[in-house]
């Protein structure tokens, strides 16, 4: 019975990165051997055991065979006769198909160290094509390390998409990998890889449709709506924004793919036009509620948020109410963070100031100065409970109006200079 450290732990060790999770493979043992050593079985589908002291996962060396379409259509064989190389051969990429023995020696039968040094993601064997999740994983690793995909691997990924393997992916697995990819350092790269292999058209056709759609060059020097979306997503990542914010950044301009061709490159009403596509993506991916809600809110309101200096006080109050800013100020703040990424996610506009964010906060704070509890109590005491909402609105408007007047005056002065 020999144990080897495998997979991501070896890869990150060789890259000089912190090793977060350690996975082990056991060669020359079976389930009875593991139980006799005090290991606890935990795997339902695979022979996985927990170490009695460290509680790290130890898996019996195994081989796999494709039995049906999709990522669950596999049977496996785990026995004492399965070698380490056979176990490593079933893995996705060469950089993940290395092992380290107890003496620290690296076992690398498929050239993982070479590909690490070259910054290349390369599949281990044709068996890569048997698991469509590997398309997403490869795109995610590209986003993490900014590695390039080997030509033969991207070709195989295209073939998988053409053969319908990506269609067999279930929403939960797509979201799981997709969410991880969005939180990598370079999520733009993930989307680029998915587009290059054709998977984006299958998994996120609404995003794929943005590429080739022109925008006004004076607002968007990058021209292409798809490129702007990638830049906005990457800006959100560079800002260190959360998963819901990055997801919203990716979907914020879906309405531009719906713009009638006769009005291009203008996109009047794309904020409203994008709401239904965002809902469709949310449903297909089964996005968590907090991600889905923020994506829809940003899509619907980002243009209004940008144009705060042009709004009347009554419109501002209506926006604060419709976006639920009074009850959910934290979500309101995250939406405005995405608006910064949208503004700065343009060619040569990475450092464009966004004073609208601070102004919206100031407007919300000012509106909150109206004592709604006191107003409600006074209305009830006067037998005018039916006027509570109206009176609260009046009090809030009285707070908003002078602040908005000052902001617009300052904006006009800046534009004149």
Swiss-Prot record:
Descriptive protein name: Multifunctional CCA protein
Coiled coil: none
Positions with a binding annotation for ATP: 8, 11, 91, 137, 140
Family to which this protein belongs: Belongs to the tRNA nucleotidyltransferase/poly(A) polymerase family. Bacterial CCA-adding enzyme type 1 subfamily.
Cofactor(s) essential for the protein: Mg(2+); Ni(2+)
Top-level lineage group: Bacteria
Residues given in the record as Mg(2+) binding sites: 21, 23
List of residues binding CTP: 8, 11, 91, 137, 140
EC assignment: 2.7.7.72, 3.1.3.-, 3.1.4.-
Catalytic activity reported: a tRNA precursor + 2 CTP + ATP = a tRNA with a 3' CCA end + 3 diphosphate; a tRNA with a 3' CCA end + 2 CTP + ATP = a tRNA with a 3' CCACCA end + 3 diphosphate
Task performed by this protein: Catalyzes the addition and repair of the essential 3'-terminal CCA sequence in tRNAs without using a nucleic acid template. Adds these three nucleotides in the order of C, C, and A to the tRNA nucleotide-73, using CTP and ATP as substrates and producing inorganic pyrophosphate. tRNA 3'-terminal CCA addition is required both for tRNA processing and repair. Also involved in tRNA surveillance by mediating tandem CCA addition to generate a CCACCA at the 3' terminus of unstable tRNAs. While stable tRNAs receive only 3'-terminal CCA, unstable tRNAs are marked with CCACCA and rapidly degraded.
Note on cofactor: Magnesium is required for nucleotidyltransferase activity.
GO biological process, one term: RNA repair
